Amino acid sequence: MDTLDRVVKPKTKRAKRFLEKREPKLNENIKNAMLIKGGNANATVTKVLKDVYALKKPYGVLYKKKNITRPFEDQTSLEFFSKKSDCSLFMFGSHNKKRPNNLVIGRMYDYHVLDMIELGIENFVSLKDIKNSKCPEGTKPMLIFAGDDFDVTEDYRRLKSLLIDFFRGPTVSNIRLAGLEYVLHFTALNGKIYFRSYKLLLKKSGCRTPRIELEEMGPSLDLVLRRTHLASDDLYKLSMKMPKALKPKKKKNISHDTFGTTYGRIHMQKQDLSKLQTRKMKGLKKRPAERITEDHEKKSKRIKKN
């Protein structure tokens, strides 16, 4: 049996609590990301990993030591680190003559590599190089994607999904206006991906809605798409499957229209309208001739019954 897949039995209560936190849940924990340096990572790649780690804090793990591994040839080391640090997202940085300033971004499913996309860094401006105010740690970003490629090409579609997964942060029910502090903007244009980070400034506008200004915060990256390792459609659908307990229960006889209005259908027994009490108006009073005919009908019914 592989060392990654063997069953670990806890020996202490602390170890038991630790393993219970990692067990599958209906509502999973926030996805953590691990940032790993390759055996030949240069200064540029190291700075990129540090800046991405600064954006991901506190939901990231930065490995400071170099790790000699090649993700597209052997993924066992990545899967080992994923299980060790309980991270389902990763970014691997390396540098060589064939692929200079290389980044590999990917995600795991059940501690096995699901999707993996290789990106080349063509231009980089660090957080420290842009002398503007920064956002506090743990701020949830707004993600903006511009460019038709993100909706047309399959590789770019998966890259968009992967970037959303990587930078989305915790899921929250409500967001206050002052909490919208910074934007991550991704633009796909002419075979390149431009990654920009802006701080959101709310200015006075003379009305209730504030005036919005964007101030570049960093980091800034110009990327180019290289190799891809994408999951099959069946495995991708399996990873997106929702547990039955989380699926909303269907309510009978209730429907909704496009505007969100709720309609309900009520099932009732057939009502005898002849016994319905109406307003006693002079015009609705029965005439003597009508009363005589009704009395005759009632008498005939009694005779038939007898």
Curated annotation (Swiss-Prot):
Keyword flag Nucleus: yes
Pfam families with a match to the protein in the record: Brix (PF04427)
Ranges of Basic residues composition bias in the record: 277-286
Region spans: Disordered: 270-306
GO biological process, one term: regulation of signal transduction by p53 class mediator
Regions of compositional bias (Basic and acidic residues) in chain numbering: 287-298
UniProt KW keywords: Nucleus, Ribosome biogenesis
PANTHER family found in the cross-reference section: BRIX DOMAIN CONTAINING PROTEIN (PTHR12728), RIBOSOME PRODUCTION FACTOR 2 HOMOLOG (PTHR12728:SF0)
Functional description taken from the UniProt entry: Involved in ribosomal large subunit assembly. May regulate the localization of the 5S RNP/5S ribonucleoprotein particle to the nucleolus.
Protein name: Ribosome production factor 2 homolog
Species per Swiss-Prot/TrEMBL record: Homo sapiens (Human)
